[in-house]
């Protein structure tokens, strides 16, 4: 989820 970046929380979960 690096595309967003904003959603760092979800990004970490997604990997």
Curated annotation (Swiss-Prot):
Superkingdom, natural source: Eukaryota
Keywords on record: ATP-binding, Calvin cycle, Kinase, Nucleotide-binding, Transferase
Broad enzyme group: transferase
Pathway the protein contributes to: Carbohydrate biosynthesis; Calvin cycle
One GO BP: reductive pentose-phosphate cycle
UniProt key word Glycoprotein: no
Reactions listed under catalytic activity: D-ribulose 5-phosphate + ATP = D-ribulose 1,5-bisphosphate + ADP + H(+)
GO terms assigned for molecular function: ATP binding; phosphoribulokinase activity
EC number: 2.7.1.19
Oligomeric form and interacting partners: Heterodimer of a 40 kDa and a 41 kDa subunit.
Similarity section: Belongs to the phosphoribulokinase family.
Protein name: Phosphoribulokinase, 41 kDa subunit
Species the sequence originates in: Selenastrum minutum
């Amino acid at each position: 989820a690096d595309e967003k970046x904003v959603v760092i929380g979800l990004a970490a979960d997604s990997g």
